[in-house]
C-alpha cells in the first residue's frame, strides 16, 4: 500500500546514495489482488529487485497453527492480521540473505488512516484518537509484527514509529492533519 511504498522509496534512495546492493522488495497476496499489481508498479518505478509471492487461501489457512505459536496468541483479530507478515517473513528467510525488513506499520495510527477516523466530529477528537492508538500500539501492532517476522530470524523495522518522526508529525497542528470528509487518506504522508 501507500505506507510500504513510501518506505520502499526512502530505503531505495538510501541504498542508491550509499552504493548499496539493489533493494529487494516483496509483496504477498492472493491471485488477482490489486495490491500486487500496485506493488509491481512501484517496484518497477523504483528499480528494485521485486518478488511477488502469490498464495492460495489454503496457504493462509495452513499457516494458522504456526502463526498462533509464533505470536503466542489465539486472538482472532491478531492471528488474522499476523498471517501475511508471518508468511512473507518465512518466504524471505528461505529465499534471501536479508536480515532486516522495513514495513509501513504505524502509519494508520499516526495519520488517522482508518476509515472510522473520518467520522471524528472534529480535529481535536481526531488528534485524541491518533494519540490513543499510538500510546497502545506496542501492545498490539508492533508486538504482533515483531513476533510474526522475527520468528523467522528476521528483524522488522517500523520507520513510521520512529520517535523523532512521531514527535515531528504530531507537532503539526491537528487542524492540518485532519481531513474530515476528504477522500484523500493520509494526505500529509
What are these regions (language model features)?
Residues 2-189:
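ATP-dependent adenylate-handling active sites, centered on carboxylate activation for C-N bond formation
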Amino acid at each position: 500500500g501507500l505506507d510500504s511504498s513510501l518506505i520502499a522509496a526512502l530505503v531505495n534512495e538510501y541504498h542508491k546514495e550509499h552504493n548499496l546492493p539493489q533493494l529487494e522488495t516483496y509483496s504477498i497476496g492472493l491471485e488477482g489482488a490489486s495490491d500486487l499489481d500496485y506493488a509491481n508498479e512501484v517496484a518497477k518505478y523504483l528499480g528494485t529487485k521485486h518478488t511477488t509471492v502469490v498464495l492460495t487461501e489454503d496457504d493462509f489457512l495452513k499457516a494458522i497453527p504456526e502463526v498462533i505459536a509464533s505470536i503466542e496468541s489465539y486472538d482472532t483479530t491478531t492471528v488474522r492480521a499476523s498471517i501475511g507478515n508471518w508468511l512473507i517473513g518465512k518466504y524471505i528467510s528461505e529465499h534471501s540473505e536479508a536480515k532486516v525488513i522495513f514495513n509501513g506499520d504505524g502509519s494508520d495510527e499516526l495519520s488517522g488512516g482508518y476509515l472510522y477516523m473520518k467520522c471524528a466530529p472534529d480535529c481535536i477528537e481526531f488528534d485524541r484518537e491518533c494519540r490513543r492508538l499510538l500510546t497502545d500500539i506496542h501492545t498490539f501492532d508492533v508486538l504482533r509484527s515483531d513476533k510474526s517476522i522475527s520468528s523467522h530470524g528476521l528483524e522488522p523495522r517500523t520507520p513510521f514509529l520512529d520517535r523523532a518522526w512521531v514527535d515531528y508529525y504530531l507537532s503539526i497542528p491537528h487542524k492540518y492533519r485532519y481531513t474530515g470528509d476528504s477522500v484523500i487518506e493520509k494526505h500529509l504522508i
